Amino acid sequence: MKPKVLLITAMLFIASTGLSQREKPKLHSDFYFGSYPVLRDGASLLEKADARLLLVGFHQGWTIEKIAKESKVAEPELDRLFADLEEARLASEIDLDERKPMLPVIRDRDIVNVQRSLQMHTQEFTSLLRSNWSEIEAALAPLTGAKDIPSAQLMYQVVVGSILFGGMHDAFFADQTIMVNPPRRMGSQRYYAWLVESDPIRAGILKREQWESDGFTIVSIGKGLPQNRTNLERIRMERGLILEEAEARRLRSFLAIFTRERLLPYFKKNRSGFLNVVNEFDAGKYVSVSSAFAWYYDQMANGVVENLVSAKLIQPPAGHYTYALKVPGPR
């Protein structure tokens, strides 16, 4: 009896695996938006299913007329949505019959193709960061503005909110060899963006948001975006991380040197490998390498955070951590 049960179980597993790996239709709206830096405007626009349909259709090389026919959405409505996407610089018109996304559309098969490389790069980057852990701890130890914060919480805020998200991007943009400054969007906004099929985790769970208030740069880091931004007074009341000018300058200097000298060389050394991976994306025919790598790095960073949390080196917030660094004054 037991062999028969095992055989049935195996057959069910094979059948379910086949179903899970079956490709979805060429046109559907089960896609999720992500970006760096975080921009709420872009996310709001792509909450509309038909806007996502348009970008997926353009990714396939289809016209608005064909997308309307396949989706049963009225063509005038799609034209109106395209105008919104074009204004936000998330889509562009090449000519009357050709439009393209201005962000990579990442499909399930792209994820499958890069999964092994992504796991390898995430583990390597985790190991590199851990090998320099004591240097980060030593830099934070003297900060009086951090004295009331438990070590694992402080390390989360700095490592996740200021190194993996923030510091590494600044290092990439300054170096320009693998990822250049984000493309210009609406008005003065500049950000990388992506649309990922099936799984919101693959669009990036962790969100870093930054703004200025009362002479401070305020940073929020956590899963998703908080509904409302936290002000400086609330951070003070909750005895959060607040660094005045001298300590903020010292931390910024450390972060710039650390990311440039300890972490960036790994990416430069393996540049050809990273380029080979992102060139496998179907989106490579219409977006830059930088745009594809922005998504790939976001996935790496999210994976590194999972590894560090599992190792109990950092403590994630119940919702979000919010901290403040004094804006540099004239010297």
Where are these predicted regions, by residue range?
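Minor-groove-contacting beta-hairpin "wing" of winged helix-turn-helix DNA-binding domains
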Residues: 97-103
